[in-house]
Amino acid sequence: MSFNHQEIEKKWQAYWEENKTFRTPDETDKPKFYALDMFPYPSGAGLHVGHPEGYTATDILSRMKRMQGYNVLHPMGWDAFGLPAEQYALDTGNSPAEFTEKNINTFRNQIKSLGFSYDWDREVNTTDPNYYKWTQWIFLKLFEKGLAYVDEIPVNWCPALGTVLANEEVIDGKSERGGHPVERRPMKQWMLKITAYADRLLEDLDELDWPESLKDMQRNWIGRSEGAEVHFNIDGTDKKFTIFTTRPDTLFGATYCVLAPEHALVAEITTEDQKGAVEAYIDVVKSKSDLERTELAKEKTGVFTGAYAINPVNGEKLPIWIADYVLASYGTGAVMAVPAHDERDYEFAKTFDLPMKEVVKGGDITKEAYTADGEHIDSAFLNGLNKEEAIAKMIEWLEVTGAGNQKVTYRLRDWLFSRQRYWGEPIPIIHWEDGTMTAVKEEELPLVLPKTDNIRPSGTGESPLANIDEWVNVVDPETGKKGRRETNTMPQWAGSCWYYLRYIDPNNNEALVDPEKAKQWLPVDIYIGGAEHAVLHLLYARFWHKVLYDIGVVPTKEPFQQLFNQGMILGENNEKMSKSKGNVVNPDDIVASHGADTLRLYEMFMGPLDASIAWSENGLDGARRFLDRVWRLFVQENGELSEKITDAPNKELEKAYHQTVKKVTEDYEELHFNTAISQMMMFINDAYKAETLPKEYVEGFVKLLAPVAPHIAEELWSKLGYNETITYASWPTFDESKLVEDEVEIVVQVMGKVRAKLKMKKDASKEEMEQLALEEVKEQIEGKTVRKVIVVPGKLVNIVAN
């Protein structure tokens, strides 16, 4: 007999909604637990089976913690600004707001059909003006602190999309969306000074309970380097440029210098003879993305400018080249090249037949660059020193002579914060005709995104907002001065940087979050989501959180105490699920055919939560069969409780039950859901063999199952005679003493050969062991004389007989 999942799931979902079962009260003396999911972008495709994997994991924890007496905050919302809605609007002429609202309604219904225990009264939507009022407020605070500024920088301009793209949105020189060509062009952009927080973003990682691999990704992205800046004069001019190097000890080995093609000095120093070649080269570089110029570049390219730099340490003339592997946006946009001791410089020197000069002993520079430590040679006052000593000595020399200084740099760049799109938060800034700019007053927030039918890109590089005259043009009521609103909008990252704070206090019109509530709920106890957000989203959210900490809005330095990346659910053929491959599994179909509880159980049982695993219909059927077995064990054909269930204890199930409570509880805490489910399956096997089932064990088992399969658990709970939801029933406990084996297996040997194995009491005496063993091997020793019996208590009896 099978249970009717459609009936049961609808019934309990209606009950939870009606009774607001999962509403989180703020005032409580219970300890808190804040479980956060990465909120989804509500795409037109709807929910896919990858979403519920992480959501089920946090839901299991949330449901267990409620039963353990915690006040649990487990919310859901929508990261709803962004390119796809705008692209849809461009393609169809419909409004992105309507498209987004329709998608959100679909997502909400799908998520509710899976039985997650969210407090829907706290739902947030990044496109709601009452929400983005506070996104804009945070921007004003960044602006006040000097952390938001305008800069002219080379950006990835995509003419077809009419917008600037972030580096992540450019793949092989083409836009990720649509595969359109992308070129580099300088434009005025809003930047956020995340580099001002680089050290803190790095150091505070140590205090977090995050996977080490993820912390390393953040560390590498921030990329702290210690070294020196060195100033090079340009021969025959009064101009100079500065380079940064982590190996100032190799300055005597420099044989040429390289500037980024965009470097401001290039046009000024290039000689007449080289002008044509330099301009042609710069033209080619324009269309390449940073990634193509550096990591993806197969061969080194470059051109000599005709100019020379003077090495400050020995006065030698070094030819100045330009090459695309040096980026204007990275470091100083200039490098000194030491081909004997740097692999990239070595390749470049080999390609263009440039000289090399060995200054550190230990390698063979005819074969490759030598980058390890060694004794310095041909380096005047550094001769005989090792790397560490030579670096310190050279920095001292640079500082005394004024030729340079000690310096720490970061790979991290400031955050490009403007988008030339319509569907984003307006940036609350006004540019006046006299060249000044001011922030919109706080009391005038939210600066609402105007409705418009014309959201085509302006084509000038400005956003479609530039087309809406009545919105863009403003007049200062006090001075009559004319101005224009900022037409760039914020990136999709903005709204997702702080949403976890708004869940704490979603309806507050006076503040982003009430400080008392922030103190109560922060930091987030566990944050679960996909690894694709391991760097940027988490880095940006940590940056904003630290700014809010500095201005007293939040009480903690870090937002997320524990973080976990779920794996990916692949198609049955082990490929990534995608519409084009036709291997996407729709959760709605599974909920209809197998039930939400089955889907939840299956996704948790597939394997470790962080592994990427292929979807399997067989596995799904197996998960349903297990739930059917549970149902049949506890419920008769007529829907009544099984007659096996009794108030009397059952010694034979005692150990299995206490073991199950212990293992499932510990595994849930550790996010080892697959092994917890395995343990529950073993218990059900034992329970089928038992004559009777103590009601206490049945109730305990149903509570353990509830976080994974809440609908069937609620139904069983009501059949066990309870009128209230299982949500706040107390979590089962185990007794350590019941886990101890009171019987042991004894090996019986005759003349050293194993003849029998016996179960006996753990604390049996030597005499009892000997007596039982002799009884057991009576036949084997018949007609023989027992010479000696060796007894090892609790382990072995060896009989010597001949």
Curated annotation (Swiss-Prot):
Quick one: where is this thing mainly located? cytoplasm
Say if the entry is tagged with keyword DNA repair: no
Protein location: Cytoplasm
**Which UniProt keyword terms apply here?**
Aminoacyl-tRNA synthetase, ATP-binding, Cytoplasm, Ligase, Nucleotide-binding, Protein biosynthesis
Query: TM spans, by residue?
Result: none
Q: Which GO terms describe its biological process?
A: leucyl-tRNA aminoacylation
Annotated ATP binding sites? K579
User: Which reaction does this chain catalyze?
Assistant: tRNA(Leu) + L-leucine + ATP = L-leucyl-tRNA(Leu) + AMP + diphosphate
Give the protein name, as stated in the record.
Leucine--tRNA ligase
Q: What is the lineage of its organism?
A: Bacteria, Bacillati, Bacillota, Bacilli, Bacillales
Q: Which gene encodes it?
A: leuS
